[in-house]
């Protein structure tokens, strides 16, 4: 459709294709809930896809529960089962689920209009490292990005404090004024 997008505002920006996480492969990582949801979605789209081709045995109870739980409950289930990346993912996970990962990823990092990104420094739902990697990729692709890193805030806690900055960004974009390009934010 013909939509004139003049700017984009995002907080807690997911970067599903990033390998950057705050957790090592041996630490319990609640963001594995998203990976398991992706695997469950892939199986719904392609019932012949065997989840055990990409997920290890330890992840299967959480995988089985994924279609019945909301994300917060799934986070708890991941923590209860002490799932780490090493306990959850088989080495060829990205190969098995590659088509789905590509389909839900961003088609380009080069946006024609400016992008505002608000990231909580202590976000455990969408790791700041992966969000900031996406910011850097967008900047490198030529997108005008105004990124903010909010000190001490988590995923949900970032939304309201970011309004001051995102509203200023929106007003500038609507008025045709340049934004404050910031590709490497420091905690504020």
Where are the predicted features?
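Accessory cap/linker subdomain of secreted extracellular hydrolases
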Residues: 11-107
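Conserved hydrolase catalytic core segment
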Residues: 1-6
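The serine-hydrolase catalytic nucleophile loop
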Residues: 129
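A structural signal for short secondary-structure junctions
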Residues: 107-111, 141-142
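Extended hydrophobic secondary-structure segments that form protein cores and membrane-embedded regions
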Residues: 7-13, 117, 149-150
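C-terminal catalytic histidine-bearing segment of alpha/beta-hydrolase fold enzymes
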Residues: 22, 93, 98-99, 132-188
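Short beta-strand/loop motif that positions the catalytic acidic residue
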Residues: 111, 116-123
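Acidic catalytic loop of the alpha/beta-hydrolase fold
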Residues: 121-126, 155-156
